[in-house]
């Protein structure tokens, strides 16, 4: 029962946030959290069914209407994750968005928008998420619901979803990402760099704002991102021919170049191979190229010097190329450190997948603003517990997954097998997992991918 006791102790440490001036809600928080592990479908009705003594309407009220401190829960989890992560490598605050396909038009923030989970435009709910990572360990630390412009300008919908007045202002995903970075800094969460995909990397204003905060960043960019190899000067171009008016608008005195065009022009000797880290599918390695470039902020009409990082990796479909900008330079960081930072975006995707497949983040069926905030807060809180369990058990169980922890807790709560049967089941599962890993390495020696 040791793991269950650790879960109880962990949850008890959060009980201060589950109350208001007249009521305490910790018993509901505890049952909901354990129900996430017990129930196959993680909506309120199924979670209540996993606890036979829990009334559905009281749990519904706890999630949708009670005024406990969801932000306090998220912030405590973020600080706990910051303290728990090993300080072995550069810590990254990695940002990504995630979408969940929805039916109907009542769920808060739902709309016809691009949904990464579906890989297309769909009727969906989208959130911007942040995870904290160091080495091979990571956990979610923040989340902001994205409200499309149509929602912010529709008072009736906002009233029905009970969205607070201060949150009825349209913010882009990049603006939500910047708010999260600012908030983590204010909390004292420790991270060495900010990472994100091309949606955020192509937002030059976000990069400038991060620069203004003194944050190191490694942001992916799209292949059509324009760059300048030398710092341009502003000038009014000369008039061409006799027809037309004389040019009056200043432009850069040299043409820009797309990053993919620049990449195609590189020679073989312009690349170097870097082995980044061990993974479950062999060593993560690639051919890397680094080049100082200048990028244009059209809004501020300014040029900023950045380091372009390009990685080429072989895949089953051929070759994959990844482009990133960073405000780091090679005098501060080694090529391997920069390659490591670029590769860390994997972990926010993994955390989101874990939050959905193991903790049911994509199974919310509530409609109100506060309900979404409450369920995400509970989800992030449990993510912090999973991280601590992985770290605690690492020396004995380096391949322990969130799904393993969930299954073990379910087993202890339901006690459908003996301890010996459950340990044997997990042993053979990890043995098969290790055998799959070893197939990707040439050597016969067992390799611990988490080290």
Regions found by a protein language model. Name each.
Residues 386-416:
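Conserved nucleotidyltransferase catalytic core and NTase-mimicking acidic/glycine-rich helix/loop elements
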Residues 1-195, 199-229, 233, 240-259, ...:
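Conserved, well-structured functional cores that handle cations and Mg-NTP chemistry
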């Amino acid at each position: 029962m040791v793991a269950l006791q650790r879960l109880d102790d962990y949850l008890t440490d959060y009980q201060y946030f589950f109350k208001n001036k007249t009521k305490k809600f910790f018993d509901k928080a505890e049952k909901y959290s354990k129900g996430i592990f017990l129930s196959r479908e993680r909506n309120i009705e199924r979670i209540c069914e996993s606890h036979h003594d829990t009334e559905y309407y009281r749990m519904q009220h706890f999630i949708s209407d009670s005024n406990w401190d969801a932000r306090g829960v998220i912030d405590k989890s973020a600080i706990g994750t910051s303290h728990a992560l090993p300080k072995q490598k550069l810590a990254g605050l990695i940002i990504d968005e995630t979408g969940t396909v929805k039916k109907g038009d009542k769920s808060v923030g739902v709309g016809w928008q691009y949904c990464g989970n579906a890989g297309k435009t769909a009727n969906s709910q989208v959130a911007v998420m942040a995870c904290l990572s160091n080495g091979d360990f990571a956990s979610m630390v923040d989340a902001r619901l994205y409200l499309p412009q149509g929602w912010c300008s529709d008072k009736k919908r906002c009233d029905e979803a009970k969205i607070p007045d201060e949150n009825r202002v349209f913010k882009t995903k990049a603006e939500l990402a910047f708010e999260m970075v600012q908030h983590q800094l204010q909390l004292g969460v420790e991270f060495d760099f900010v990472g994100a995909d091309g949606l955020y990397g192509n937002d030059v204003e976000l990069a400038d704002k991060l620069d203004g905060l003194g944050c190191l960043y490694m942001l992916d960019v799209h292949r059509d991102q324009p760059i300048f190899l030398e710092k341009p000067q502003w000038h009014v171009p000369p008039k061409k021919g006799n027809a037309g008016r004389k040019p009056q608008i200043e432009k850069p005195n040299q043409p820009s170049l797309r990053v993919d065009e620049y990449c195609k022009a590189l020679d073989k000797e312009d690349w170097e191979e870097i082995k980044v880290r061990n993974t479950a599918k062999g060593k993560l390695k690639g051919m890397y190229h680094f080049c100082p470039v200048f990028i244009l902020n059209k809004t501020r009409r300014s040029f900023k010097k950045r380091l372009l990082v390009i990685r080429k990796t072989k895949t089953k479909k051929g070759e994959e190329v990844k482009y990133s900008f960073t405000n780091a330079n090679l005098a501060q960081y080694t090529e391997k450190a920069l390659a490591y930072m670029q590769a860390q975006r994997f972990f926010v995707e993994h955390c989101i997948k874990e939050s959905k497949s193991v903790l049911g983040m994509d199974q919310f069926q509530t409609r109100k603003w506060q309900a979404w905030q409450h369920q995400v807060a509970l989800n992030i809180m449990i993510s912090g517990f999973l991280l601590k369990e992985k770290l605690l058990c690492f020396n004995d169980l380096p391949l322990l997954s969130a799904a393993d922890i969930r299954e073990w807790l379910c087993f202890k709560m339901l006690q459908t097998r003996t301890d010996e049967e459950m340990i044997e089941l997990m042993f053979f599962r990890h043995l098969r997992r290790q055998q799959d890993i070893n197939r990707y390495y040439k050597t016969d020696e067992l390799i611990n991918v988490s080290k």
